[in-house]
């Protein structure tokens, strides 16, 4: 329950700062996790990216401000963080379907998006297999791409990198270098601590590879969930981990990378494991 309470405290912080700057790192601190893990949890639990939720809340309040008085559009835009009237107009129309200049007209309808409240709902769903393992640090080698701090901006970047290395032969080269546990092609999101965020496509290997990068995955305790199926099934498993397992598990996110292990990378029926770093709650 503490985990859910912290998420709701983070929502309270967002509400207090809708007319100011919202610090994603502070959200992570309130929720006792990295800003990356907070954004992932929020997206799965709320059904929308964090940035979209914030935009909807701001535009909901902006409509109230414009309807209820003589506030100038430029002042309301500035209040909610838009330095450009054009950007504000675009955001307002995307939510309400009308221009902000027409909001005071008789009979005009706007949308209201109230604040989210998280709670635990127990329902009868399928079982989840997992194991808890504590592992020493291990070396991976491969290629990486930088990630944005707003994770939805990376949705096209990561698949593009997988496609690139599949075509240019790098993926097959990595598979041949693989000689240590965990055995499989790894997708590693290093979005923890103060380091720059990166996504690695790599293998656990003792070998050196010309033109390849290396990263040391820190020692950590991992909750490991096996699965099989398409890429969509991986996303569904990750959603269930965050929304069903984590809130009642007695664990919370640790400050370490997220890992996907592709044991058999058949795009139609892959065998994989999802590793999330955990510590005992409290």
Where in this protein do the model-derived segments appear?
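Conserved hydrophobic/aromatic pocket- or pore-lining residues that grip, position, or stack substrates
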Residues: 14, 38, 241
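A solvent-exposed interaction/effector surface
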Residues: 64-67, 74, 78, 83-282
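Alpha-helical structural signal in soluble globular domains
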Residues: 41, 45-46, 53, 95-96, ...
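Append "Primarily bacterial transcriptional regulators
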Residues: 25-34, 38, 42, 76-83, ...
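Short, Lys/Arg-enriched, disordered terminal segments
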Residues: 1-4, 280-282
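Terminal helix-turn-helix DNA-binding modules in bacterial transcription factors
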Residues: 4, 8-25, 44-80, 107-126
């Amino acid at each position: 329950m503490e985990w859910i309470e912290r998420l709701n405290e983070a929502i309270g912080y967002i509400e207090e700062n809708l007319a100011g700057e919202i610090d994603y790192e502070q959200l992570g601190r309130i929720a006792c996790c990295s800003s990356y893990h907070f954004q992932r949890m929020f997206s799965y639990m709320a059904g929308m990216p964090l940035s979209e939720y914030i935009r909807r809340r701001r535009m909901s309040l902006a409509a109230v401000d414009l309807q209820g008085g003589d506030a100038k559009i430029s002042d309301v835009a500035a209040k909610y963080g838009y330095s450009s009237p054009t950007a504000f107009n675009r955001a307002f129309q995307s939510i309400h379907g009308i221009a902000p200049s027409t909001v005071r007209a008789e009979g005009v309808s706007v949308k209201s998006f109230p604040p989210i409240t998280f709670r635990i709902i127990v329902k009868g769903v399928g079982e989840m297999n997992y194991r808890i393992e504590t592992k020493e640090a291990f070396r991976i080698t491969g290629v990486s791409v930088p990630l944005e701090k707003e994770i939805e901006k990376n949705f096209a970047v990561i698949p593009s990198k997988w496609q690139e290395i599949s075509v240019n032969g790098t993926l097959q080269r990595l598979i041949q270098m693989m000689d240590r546990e965990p055995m499989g092609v790894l997708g590693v999101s290093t979005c923890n601590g103060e380091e720059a965020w990166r996504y690695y496509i790599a293998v656990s290997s003792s070998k050196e590879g010309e033109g390849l990068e290396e990263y040391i995955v820190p020692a950590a305790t991992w909750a490991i969930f096996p699965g099989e199926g398409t890429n969509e099934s991986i996303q569904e498993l990750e959603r269930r981990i965050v929304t069903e397992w984590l809130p009642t598990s007695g664990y919370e996110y640790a400050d370490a990378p997220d890992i996907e292990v592709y044991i058999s990378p058949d795009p139609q029926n892959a065998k994989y494991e999802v590793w999330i770093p955990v510590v005992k709650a409290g």
